[in-house]
Amino acid sequence: MNILIFGPPGSGKSTHSRTITERYGLTYISSGDMIRAEIEKGSELGKELKKYLAKGELIPDIVVNTLVISRLRRDRNNFIIDGYPRTAEQVLALENYLYDHGIRIDVAMEIFISKEESVERISGRRICPKCGAVYHLRYRPPKVPGKCDLCGSQLIQREDDRSEIVAKRYDLYVKNMEPIIKFYKKQGIYVRVDGHGSINEVWERIRPLLDYIHNREKKRKENE
């Protein structure tokens, strides 16, 4: 089973991607994780990528395409790709690669939330720069305001978590995804899931669909 999953900032797609990965034994491929790993290396590329994120702008297509497709060369089937493709150029690069290698996508799933919900979820997030613990001012506040429960360090807000940056990222997401959604609708594999509510509530909207696809693909392979 091969899945594309996408959604606006704060939609919970990465959280659900990891649950899906574990439940169905898939390989998790995240463009965001690969970009952040490059930034953490402190490489010249990482420094350039950090500038784009700080301004709420998309990473250049050629960079993201190279990162994702190089990963796909190692894991050609049973994968979930989180947050890619996000532009028409990325769709073209991915589709060309899949066609050349006889790979098909079973479902392109969008977890959708409103702009207001997106801004609230992301802008309230606080990170511990020392141990990496994540908090939220509303949903998971620290015991002592501004301090990490685990190590006592001062919590910070990432630059790209500021409300004005989140709003910009949301608008950019909606604009860029419109033609991509149309493309996957034409292929008959696009599904939109309501991302409002708790993690468990959203998961119960996702699980029946993926169970069905998983069982369908299992039977298809048995009959080959």
Curated annotation (Swiss-Prot):
Monomer. Consists of three domains, a large central CORE domain and two small peripheral domains, NMPbind and LID, which undergo movements during catalysis. The LID domain closes over the site of phosphoryl transfer upon ATP binding. Assembling and dissambling the active center during each catalytic cycle provides an effective means to prevent ATP hydrolysis. Some bacteria have evolved a zinc-coordinating structure that stabilizes the LID domain. Transmembrane segments: none annotated. Keywords: ATP-binding, Cytoplasm, Kinase, Metal-binding, Nucleotide biosynthesis, Nucleotide-binding, Transferase, Zinc. Catalyzes the reversible transfer of the terminal phosphate group between ATP and AMP. Plays an important role in cellular energy homeostasis and in adenine nucleotide metabolism. Residues 30-59 are annotated as: NMP. It catalyses: AMP + ATP = 2 ADP. This is Adenylate kinase. AMP binds at S31, R36, E57, L58, I59, G83, Y84, P85, R86, Q90, R158, R169. Zn(2+) binds at C128, C131, C148, C151. ATP binds at G10, S11, G12, K13, S14, T15, R125, V134, Y135, G197. It is found in: Cytoplasm. GO terms for cellular component: cytoplasm. Belongs to the adenylate kinase family. NCBIfam families: adk, PRK00279.2-5. One of its GO terms (molecular function) is adenylate kinase activity. Its main location: cytoplasm. GO terms for biological process: AMP salvage. Residues 124-161 are annotated as: LID. Pathway: Purine metabolism; AMP biosynthesis via salvage pathway; AMP from ADP: step 1/1. Its EC number is 2.7.4.3. Disulfide bonds: none annotated.
